[in-house]
Amino acid sequence: MFLAASREYERNAILGPIERNMTVAIAQAFRKQGKAFLGRFQDLADKLPGILTESEWIELLELAQLETRDLFVNTATEGATLAMVAGIRRTADDLGLPETVLGGAKTWTALLTVAGLRKLLRGGAGAGGPPGLFGALAGAAEMPPVAVVLGIQFGLQNPRAVDYISRVGAALVTKIDETTRDYIRTVITTGVREGQSYNEIAKAITSRYSEFAVGRPQLHIDSRAHLIAVTEVGQAYSEGNHIVGETLRDAGLKMEKRWLVMGDERTCPVCMGNEGVDWIPFDQMFPSGHMRPLAHPACRCDLLMQAVT
């Protein structure tokens, strides 16, 4: 129990600010998308109340989604990058193996701020490199490592990290867009079926987008924007953990892993079952079929690893 509480505190200390910043940015993106859609949806006002086919409004929504796509992609990419670096640092520190880190920081706790992580990433592009986080990503191949364990470099130049970061933004936007279409379809279909006016349907659409930004879908989740942030940051953090294990395994070390739950009333039976098997071989799936956390959206579980001598 102490281990879980300690890990949760440390995890929240570094991921909490990333999640909050990402939540705010995603909420703003939802608001802008809602405004962009309603601006186009107004062209259909003369048809309401009345029959409105999906093809008439879906194209307008897709245009609004395209207009705001970069807001979601850039936010997801930055949040995932910061969380992945934190995950790599956390695991390198966990394993208790020799490491060197940019800027002379010797433990992951030296980076317990979003600003610290951004400074780490931006500093890697070199004096002549492009500025900002995405400049650092563009120069990832030339970046010093985030950590070096037993002579093995870990950081954004790692092929597994590059692959994950390069696709996370687009993959997330695809899921967000699909879910948004389902929500808006329900709002419009219900409105048309009930003979609502344009103003009534537009108000319902506005309300739905507002809920995306500030609603409360779960007890410990404030909104859809928060749910997305918590899930994507957690996934990237866990992927950073896993990348260290994969690379050490490929280098010839025998690795084991363990699923760690937070152990409170919010812990689900699936995650409890994963923790119940204790330490397992690194390449073995947990009972849920996952190789690592997260088992579900908003999952708060952590991954422990150890080298077997």
Model regions and ranges:
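Acidic, glycine-rich two-metal-ion catalytic cores of nucleic acid-processing enzymes
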Residues: 218-309
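N-terminal leader/targeting and assembly helices and adjacent pre-domain segments
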Residues: 1-215, 307-309
